[in-house]
Amino acid sequence: MSDSAATDTKQSFQLKSASVSLTALELYYFDNDEFEANLRDKISQAPGFFKDIPLIISLEKYEGLDSELDFFRMIGTCRRHNIHVIGVRAANDDQRRLARGASLALLPGGSLKEKPAQEAPAQAEPEAAAAPEPANEPAPAKIINQPVRSGQQVYAPEGDLIILAPVQAGAEVLAAGNIHVYGPLRGRALAGIHGAESARVFCQSLEAELVSIAGHYKISEDLQDIGWKSAVQIQLRDDVLVVTPLDKA
């Protein structure tokens, strides 16, 4: 092939940044039989939600022995239920070696642990009051004027998401903060995706396939008891999603 021909040849791929919705499995200990039984129970609550999803194993709260971690069995169990384990989060050095052996991606922890406060020195001289720092401006809301159609995903990584149109079945909307839908919400809405438990979801007609706040979710069947096909707000109270009609909020 000539140099000019090689120059004109297009590359076979291009790397781009992407934002995707991932589900994390927060593992406390691992026993394969119990793991599969718990997994089967979760899937039975929302079979459509779990089908062919990518999954991250989070080890931030893992209390079992590292020697009990069998990622190969974990991957196989999940795969039998059409769930695809793609990586491990917040692993220590030994856990990282086990994860590498199972060809899993390694991700950092979701949040940093707090450091213990240091004791103040005895008889410390009072310091002059520092000038107050300017308050951080809240992240601007992302505003969508068009309907969000089936197969589309709209993501607000820092603030609220405001949609001035319907969200169709099969669509997905995600936000770090609140989600406002000025129309029917028929797809999936995930608010507080970085862990903000104060986030809320507002819509003019609740017909959603799934609503999630800070990882706590309800599927369509669970949402139909209160406020179905009416204007509601949804918030998290004591780790449970609570639906309140807007005329009673």
Curated annotation (Swiss-Prot):
It holds the Pfam family MinC_C. Residues 118-141 have a biased composition (Low complexity). Keywords: Cell cycle, Cell division, Septation. Residues 115-141 are annotated as: Disordered. The keyword Repressor does not apply. Transmembrane segments: none annotated. One of its GO terms (biological process) is regulation of cell division. InterPro entries: CAP/MinC_C, MinC, MinC_C_sf, MinC_N, Septum_form_inhib_MinC_C. SUPFAM superfamilies: Cell-division inhibitor MinC, C-terminal domain (SSF63848). Belongs to the MinC family. Interacts with MinD and FtsZ. Cell division inhibitor that blocks the formation of polar Z ring septums. Rapidly oscillates between the poles of the cell to destabilize FtsZ filaments that have formed before they mature into polar Z rings. Prevents FtsZ polymerization. This is Probable septum site-determining protein MinC. It comes from Marinobacter nauticus (strain ATCC 700491 / DSM 11845 / VT8). The lineage of its organism: Bacteria, Pseudomonadati, Pseudomonadota, Gammaproteobacteria, Pseudomonadales. The gene is minC.
